[in-house]
Amino acid sequence: MRRKTLFLILITVALLAAGLFLARDAIRTALFDVTGEENLLAQVRGLIDYATNLIRPLPNTADDAVIDEAGGSPFGINTFLEQEVELAKRDRQLQLIAGAGYKWIRQQFPWYDIEIAGKGDFQDCRHANGGPCIDAWAKYDNIVDLAEQHGLEIIARLEAPPKWAQTASGDFAPPANLDDFGDYVAAVAARYKGRLTHYQVWNEPNNYPEWGEQPVNPEGFTRLLCAAYRRIKEVDPNAQVLAPALTPTISLDPGPGPGTGLNDFIFLQRMYEAGAGQCFDIMSAQAYGLFSGPTDRRLRPRSVNFARPLYIRDLMVQNGDARKPIWISEMNWNAVPDEVADKRFGQVSLETQARFLPLAYERVQQEWPWIGVASTWFFKRATDAEKDQAMYYFRLVDPDFTPLPVYDAMKAYTAK
């Protein structure tokens, strides 16, 4: 009897093992769909983490809310067109972007490159060498013209003060006089009224060095945001103003200094308490997966994964902003090669990057009805001077216009 029982147990274990072996691919796919992890051990750990979702309050995302400004197509991409000296290369960039199915570009209109040498000075004499200066607007007029020709809309990033406007140190320090910043954003909005419709004020002000060599300051930033909002709306009441995306961080050290910053949830709540809710039409967020894929459903406020925008949405709902959408400013995975030491943005293969980015857009469209445009980070850099830096490897296309697998994957996905 004992032998028979032992035999039955062994048969049962063997059948279970065989079943698990035969179903291993389906099991691993199911675990990836929950954890965003591809390694089996990481999937098991991730499943345990996911179980903690059941014992903590889930974000209230108000998925049934009517959203005011969806943006049409969700496909946006970050560009650095101002870095391209040759006009033909700007045109080729936008041709390839439109050809891949993107409908929006997120493009800087940096203050230091427009009102360069002093208040009211829109001439660029930096490379004149004794000859005539050029119109500082010409570059940006060309970018707007080309975007229109290729059927692309622009999210214009308004940021980066010139030295003459700053008293605090640091390239990204805010202006000493908010009226100067207001004049700049009003000048951009007036020049492109009816052609540019969406303006984003600043970028990641909760993180060093995006507020200069001084502690980050949610209340100070809110004053700048509200000043810009008023001036843009005075010029173009129909324009839409985007709040900046905040750096996803758990840091509680406002800085200044490398590695410092203020947690994005705390910074945003303090912005709301300072009155920021009246000073933007669209919220922004970063959606980096970093060390796991786009299907990661673990809700972990003390770590960064693709699900983090759910917490930004929850804060918006708590503060009465359920009708406003979130537009994702930056989204991608880092295909940094082994020889680059910096892996702070995670590391995936070129093939995995090409698989993850379309999956991210799929999740955005299927699960997050309050997301409008989601902008891929990024199309290309003008040169390979930064190829020793991890950030360079988010690109879709090399500086010589060689497309990477992720470009082809997005082109195929948007065509579906």
Which residues does each PLM region occupy?
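Acidic/histidine-rich helix-loop elements
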Residues: 77-87, 170-175, 259-261
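Noncatalytic carbohydrate-binding groove/subsite architecture in carbohydrate-active enzymes
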Residues: 178, 182, 216-347, 395-396
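Short, acidic/polar
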Residues: 84-98, 180-190, 261-273, 354-363
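Substrate-binding cleft and catalytic face of glycoside hydrolase catalytic domains
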Residues: 100-124, 128-258, 290, 333-336, ...
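N-terminal carbohydrate-binding accessory modules
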Residues: 24-104, 119-121, 127-130, 145-149, ...
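Aromatic-rich peripheral "rim/lid" segments of glycoside hydrolase catalytic domains that contact
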Residues: 4, 8, 12, 16-21, ...
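A structural motif corresponding to the C-terminal end of an alpha-helix
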Residues: 142-154, 191-196, 227-239, 274-279, ...
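Hydrophobic faces of well-ordered beta-strands that scaffold small-molecule active sites
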Residues: 73-79, 105-107, 154-158, 199-201, ...
